[in-house]
Amino acid sequence: MSGFQFKQFFIAHDCCAMKVNTDGILLGSIADPSNARHILDLGTGTGLIAIMLAQRTASAQITALELEENAFHQAQENAQRCPWNNRIDVLQADIMTWKSTKKFDLIVSNPPYFEHSLASRNKQRDLARAVTYSHFDWLKQSQQWLTPNGRISFILPCDAGKKLLEQSHLLGLYCIEYWEICTKVGLSPKRVILTFSPQYAEMALHTLTIYDENQRYTADFTQFTEIFYLKVNSK
């Protein structure tokens, strides 16, 4: 069974098109679950982000949705094997048709991001990476499940993130936090983490760099991830 060993849990990903990656680890580390009683993870994949948020909270109940069948079963197995399995519910569902009367205090997603991708020979990987619905559609769906003071956090490529930021006002949502993620010191950002809320607040801007000039994890990256990684070497 191939996968990734964290300090307190193991994520198997041999049946998933999208493997454990830095995007998921960043969102699971940075999204703010403070005071969240109910958390929703859209397109959970391996279940990584849901499990990370379970570790970071004392009692939050987490619902994780996944459409692709193989990934759904693997996310279920990963969640059942982790120390917080009594607080994670993995469901096979399409976010565009899923119905829920429950409202969530925090909604997170590392959504598909190739809006105009070329099809590969791996249909499972295509489903995981290619956007069937726009990121605006994902945000609109998320809004209906959000509590009045809740937050929605997405990680996206920079261009897609900027586009969604411009569109969010159409839903009456405010971007209250914006993280630029740089792979290495001196390089332009490759990813952004955006947090939206129906409540206005001045947008907080942050930058996080993963590697320093010596290819070691930066102190900032280490601070966010050290509770998860077995070994994190900072400067």
Swiss-Prot record:
Gene Ontology cellular-component annotations: cytoplasm
Transmembrane residue ranges: none
**Catalysed reaction, written as an equation:** adenosine(37) in tRNA1(Val) + S-adenosyl-L-methionine = N(6)-methyladenosine(37) in tRNA1(Val) + S-adenosyl-L-homocysteine + H(+)
Q: Which GO terms describe its biological process?
A: methylation; tRNA processing
Job of this protein? Specifically methylates the adenine in position 37 of tRNA(1)(Val) (anticodon cmo5UAC).
Cysteines engaged in disulfide bonds, as pairs: none
**EC number(s) on record?**
2.1.1.223
Tell me the domain of life.
Bacteria
Subcellular localization, per the record?
A: Cytoplasm
Protein name, entry field = tRNA1(Val) (adenine(37)-N6)-methyltransferase
Q: Which UniProt keywords apply?
A: Cytoplasm, Methyltransferase, S-adenosyl-L-methionine, Transferase, tRNA processing
**Organism annotation:** Glaesserella parasuis serovar 5 (strain SH0165)
**Major enzyme class:** transferase
What family does the Swiss-Prot or TrEMBL record give for this protein? Belongs to the methyltransferase superfamily. tRNA (adenine-N(6)-)-methyltransferase family.
